[in-house]
Amino acid sequence: MLVAAGQHTQRVNLGEPALEPPALLAAAARAALADAGCTGIAASIDSVRLVRSLSAREYLNAPLLVAQLAGIAAREHVVVQGGGETPGTALVRACQEIEAGTHDAVLLVAGEAWYSRTLAQRAGEAVELTAQPPDTPPPTEHGTLIEFVHPAEKALGIVRPIQQYPLFEQALRGVLGHTPTEHQQHLGRFAERCSMAAQTNPYAWDRAVHTAIEIATAAPANRYVGTPYTKLMVSNEQVDMAASVIVMSVERATALGIAPDRWVFPLAAASGEARPISERLELHNSVLAREVGRSVAALAGRACRDAAHVDLYSCFPSAMQIQARELGLDPNGPLSLTGGMRFSGGPWCGYAMHGFAAMVQALRTDPGSVGLVSANGGAITKLVVTMLSTEPSRRFLYESAQPAIDAAPHRTLAVGYTGVATIESYTVMHSAGGRIDNAIVVARTPDDRRAWGVIRDLDAAANMVDHDMAGHQVTITSDGTASRNW
């Protein structure tokens, strides 16, 4: 069970002292230790596990340094590899190992000091790192890093989430029957709800009021990144924030005197991995989220829609909407406790730890209710969904939904396709200053296979920004160059 949760956000200006990454992570760990409300808890932690932190990767053993700074004498120090799903997989493993008796108390921590380091680097200031002795043992590693993209996508440079999620969004727009203008307004309202949640979150990076109109309107300070997304719709990794939770056996918590009203029980979790985008049958939905949702609901003995508190992985609006639709949640309902990865902040792989920390507090204030947290890696490629409550189940249950995911129908990719194809989805990529770079199209061949194309004609790409291009035809060459047929 989870007995404690802590978060820490630091905001510094250029020239001001900033906590380096392990110190920031340790601040969240100390907050979790204090949240347990008992003495002696630091001495009871036998494993400190750090979700892969990009800003802490230069240390010989970052989780060891975090433990030392937090006053924890753990026997094990772990880096958990992976993407945005990693907080979910780390919690599952900790629960399983505690039930098996191999551990009694595990501290999970995630975070990034990306903003302060970027600030210093842009100003040409040296970033001071605490030096660990040369003979410092390396951390144990859990999990693996995987390639999230198909080779054909990689060959065209379509590898970044900001290129991928807009394609899902345009496909969703078609299913919803929105014109581009209507959908832009819809996205503004959707993101405004996240902004409102962030305003009540003391740890959120951006607690300013952002209206639907402001969010939806492209402007110099809110330029398009990949249509239809403006900057105020997408994850902000330029943050300094960390979160931590402590997972513990009932026996250890009882012995330490941690009050039962602090306890939150993970009831069940399920996970899976999707096919690459090239092979997914449709782009507006997710077999992965659907089957993972079915699995976790069956294990928990209640529907996902029964969760009173929800925090979905929130890197882009399409990620949240697709998850909500597949899990049976209201896409227009409250889907984030924190404010999501744009307004609360998107510390790379670690965001879902903030979701778990916020969920602990939400469930404590609403005893007996159920919460749901999702953790997503890649382009809705790896997903973990966890249901939690202050009311315990007999034991924690976990299942992989992979067999059902693998058995689902999929689409064939037309590698090296040459000829006319019909646009299935698209996005126009923008860079600094609002400059158009190109347009990415996903198309269907006459035999209903999928093909990728990149339109480098800037006039053609500009024409696609405000117009509905789904169903229009393009000509694709074998190297992936696409040209308009309109």
Model-derived regions, located:
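Active-site capping/gating regions of soluble enzymes
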Residues: 371-373
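A conserved active-site cap/scaffold subdomain adjacent to cofactor or substrate pockets
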Residues: 344-352, 363, 368
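An acidic, phosphate/nucleotide-engaging active-site surface
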Residues: 83, 92-97
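General structural concept
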Residues: 78-86
